[in-house]
Structures are given as C-alpha cells and as structure tokens.
Amino acid sequence: MTMHYGGDYNPEQWPEKTWHDDVRLMREAGVTMVSLGIFAWSRIQPAEGVFDFEWLDTVIDLLHEGGIAVDLATATASPPPWATEAYPQMLPRDENGAVYWPGSRQHFAPASPEYRRLASELVTAIAERYAKHPAVVMWHVNNEYGCHLNYDYSDNAAVAFRAWLAAKYQTVDALNAAWGTDFWSQRYTSFDQVVPPRKAPYSRNPAGELDFKRYTSDTLLDLYLMEKRIIRAAGAMQSVTTNFMGAFPPADYWAWAPHMDVVTDDNYPDPNDPESFRASAFARDLMRSLKPDTPWLLMEQATNALNWRPTNAPKAPGQMAALSMQAVARGADGIMFSSGASRGRAARSSTRRCCRKPAPAPAPGARSSNWGPSSPHCPRSRRAPATPAWPSCSTGRTGGRSATPTTPSCSTTSHSCSAGTPRSTGSTCRSTSYSRPQTSPGTASCSPRSSTC
C-alpha cells in the first residue's frame, strides 16, 4: 500500500504565476496529495449566488497533470464578509452574550439556519462540479469542528438546545429529574424556559452543562453529516472525512468515527515540551482505535516553528522525522502538513517552505519506507502517483476545463447518511487529556492539549 505525503495547499493566497512552480516543487519533494480550498469560501463565492471556479479549475488541473491527488475541502469553516454582513444573526456568542465578530475563522453559530443554508449552497456547487474529477480522491468537510469556538451560547443555540433536550427527555418532568432542578429552585415547567449555561452569579447546574456539551458535539456532527449527504447526492464516490484534533473534549470522536470514511488528525506537539510528544503518541493511538481496520491519516502537523504559542520554538534536527515516524508506527497511512509555505501577512503561519533541503539518507541497513530513499522529513525522489489507501472512484468530470474521462477505478461500500440522534443519559465524556503546565524559562506556560488548532 502506498502512503500519502503532502499537506495543505492554499494557492488563493499566492499569485497565479507561482502555481506552476508550486507543483514542480511538490513533485521534487515527493508530494502525493494536498488538501485544497479549506479557507477559500470568499474566493469560490465572492457574493451570494455568485460562484467563481475558474481559478480552482486551473489549480486542480495543474495538480492532476503533476500526478498529485487532491483532498478537496468544502470551504465552510470561515464564512466570507458578505455572508456575515447580510446575516449577522449567524454569528456566535460567548457565555456573556458577546458576539464573536468576523476577522478570524470559525465565526459561525453551528445551529444558525442562515449559516446552514449558505453552507449547503456552497457545498452543493463544489460537489456537483468536482465529484467526478480524476484528481479528487477525498473530501475534506469544514475544518477542525469546534476549534477556537468550543461552544456557542447564541439564541440559535438556545433554540436548538431545547429541541435536543425535548428529543432526549421527551417530558419536562424527566428533564427535571435528570438535572435535579429542585436544587436552588431551578425546576422547569416548559422546555422553552431552558437556556444554554450562560454566565451566572455562581456555579451552574452541572447536569445542564454536561448536556450542553453533548448537544454541542451532536450539533457539530450533524453539520458534518449535512455536508456529507450533499457530497453523496452529487454522485461523489470518494471518501469523506473531517479532521480531528486528538483528545478534544468538545467533540465525542467515538460517536463521530462511524461516520468517517477515513480518520484524520491534526497534531502540533510543542518542540520545547517533551510531555507533548507523549501526548501526541496518545493521540495517534486514539486515532487508530476510533475505527479499527479503517485508514487513518495525520492530516496536519507543523513544518517547523509556529506563531501562535507564547513561545514558538523551531523543531530540532530529527524531530520532524521522529514525529512523522511516530505516527507511522502507530498505524498512520499518510503524513501531511499544515501550511507548506510561509504566508507572510497571514494570521497563522509556519516559518519556511517545507522541503527546501533534502533530508539525510537513511542509515545503512535501515528498512526502506514508502516515501522512497529519503526520510519522511523531505523525500528527494519523485515516485509514481499514489494509489489511495481508501475508496476512490474517478470517472471524469462534468465541470472544469481539461478533464479526461477514465473508467471507474474501484467500487465502494454504501455510506450511512442518517443524522445523528441524542445519546442516552448514560453517555459519558471521553478523550479528555491535557498536557502539564511548563514552568521552565523559554517554554510555553500551558499547553491545553497536544492537538491544538
């Protein structure tokens, strides 16, 4: 089985004149697959009802001509300014009622009807255009659900939370019994009286907080399933996934995993913190265990130093290869990176273009890997285009500019597209893990989890 090697590719952040050079460098580096269009909503849809696919057609065709497969994103993780201007009610709120304004990412209320409608229209347009493109081997839904914005306390969330509670408990009396609402005179007579666990004078009902966290995980999963159904309805037969974040408390990945065709993980251990390497090993074991006998992929890791920790250390010589092989040793079927090129003015960036220098050759007698004769840090040899390790059927495409029809390359099993349902009252939170605080000079003060966003 051939293993995939590559990373996020953001051509919309670069002049078109660099795209050919990008593909050439990828070929020299042995890249076999890139994740494309993750944050490209504003470029794909510059206005409501208006779509511009010409640039994306060009990029996908260039990658295909270069033998590089595409993990095509649905681009729904960051709504464009025109959307939030027209529909400000889609913006999320914190527990104090303050609005999370545009200007970053993940600025959408998961339960917002306006966001869901706009996201559905975007995904429909993308899926219908590229479902049959021979370069597309996988679909990347949204990005890191729950990242940066763990919980939304908006009015949209309040309405959806009440509906979730009504579906779970059926009656208000059952809710009162489960939450122990006679304590502090909290007894409800209607589901409409329930609000999300917003800021209160003192500690809030812990049972209510737990249910709100379960509701949040289920709501985010429902968003994923909504997009997956649209992709399947467009006739796309490739695998569909979204990227997990290790031991991430806001999402119950054990409930999500059955709906993933490929399990993927984003992992950013701190080069200054040995404990984070152990935490990343745990995260990799977690990914392998979520859906046994299913491929899992390290979707994101840093190419070197980051810019979002209190202290941002570069990786020491050998760390890149060691962390990559740590994932391979724990069953990863591919090694990918985030931001293979520096983005200059971007809010988040790695410091250099990946794979500018060849890595040392393996030690004599070392077992050769699927990356070719070089280490996974920066393979030097160009291999034949990879054969995906998961279901992929390419039959040519109906949109775009230079598709070459091909015969179907595989068959795939049916996929479940039914929406999730609230879990029983016996459900428990899983996968909580935190790295220990650091106190030594020059290190990060605290790392909340090994797989940060």
Regions found by a protein language model. Give the residues of each.
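The substrate-binding groove and active-site-proximal loops of carbohydrate-active enzymes
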Residues: H4-E16, G37-W55, Y100-S120, N142-N150, ...
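Conserved, mostly hydrophobic/aromatic
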Residues: G7, M26, V34, L63, ...
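Aromatic-lined substrate-binding rim segments of carbohydrate-active enzymes
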Residues: H20-E28, T32-Y100, T124-A127, M226-A234, ...
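Polysaccharide-binding and catalytic clefts of secreted carbohydrate-active enzymes
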Residues: N96-V262, D266-S280
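Carbohydrate-binding surfaces of carbohydrate-active enzymes
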Residues: F191-V194, G246, A257, D265-C453
